Each structure stands twice: as structure tokens, then as C-alpha cells.
């Protein structure tokens, strides 16, 4: 199942590499790659990515669409 998200767009706007986002979020670069391709991930992983991109949890819809 594909999940719509703006992770790649936001990451590129912030001039971040996948490796840098992965390091800030505490996940692997492979995980970032899978998420950017639209693969499903755990809620905790989404939380880490939202915070690493500089958003608050209340702004989660700007990063991940349900």
C-alpha cells in the first residue's frame, strides 16, 4: 500500500541528504528511502521524521497525509 507523504519534497527544500535526515531522526537511510517511495512505516518512525524535519506533531498533516 502506498502512503502519500511530502518527506522528499520537504527534505530537499531544507537541502538535507537522506543520510542527514536519517541521522537526525534516528533511523536508517534505507528507512528514509522506503518512506519517500511511499511505503508504510510505524507511527513512531513518522513521529521521529516529523520532528527531525523541524515540524511539531500538530503539523503532521504537512508531512504525512492519511
Question: What positions do the PLM features span?
Answer:
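Short amphipathic helical patch at the helix-1/turn junction of helix-turn-helix
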Residues: 1, 12-13, 40
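Key DNA-contact positions within bacterial/archaeal DNA-binding proteins
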Residues: 19, 29-33, 58
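A short, Lys/Arg-enriched interface patch at domain edges and termini
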Residues: 63-66
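Short basic helix-loop element that most often maps to the first helix and adjoining turn
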Residues: 5-24, 48
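Recognition helix of helix-turn-helix/homeodomain-like DNA-binding domains
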Residues: 27-41
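DNA major-groove recognition helix of helix-turn-helix/homeodomain DNA-binding modules
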Residues: 44-61
Amino acid at each position: 500500500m502506498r502512503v502519500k507523504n511530502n518527506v522528499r519534497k520537504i527534505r530537499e527544500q531544507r537541502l538535507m541528504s537522506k543520510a542527514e535526515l536519517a541521522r537526525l531522526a534516528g533511523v536508517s537511510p534505507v528507512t528514509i528511502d522506503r518512506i519517500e517511495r511511499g511505503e508504510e512505516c510505524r507511527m513512531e518512525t513518522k513521529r521521529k521524521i516529523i520532528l527531525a524535519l523541524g515540524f511539531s506533531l500538530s503539523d503532521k498533516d504537512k508531512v504525512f497525509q492519511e
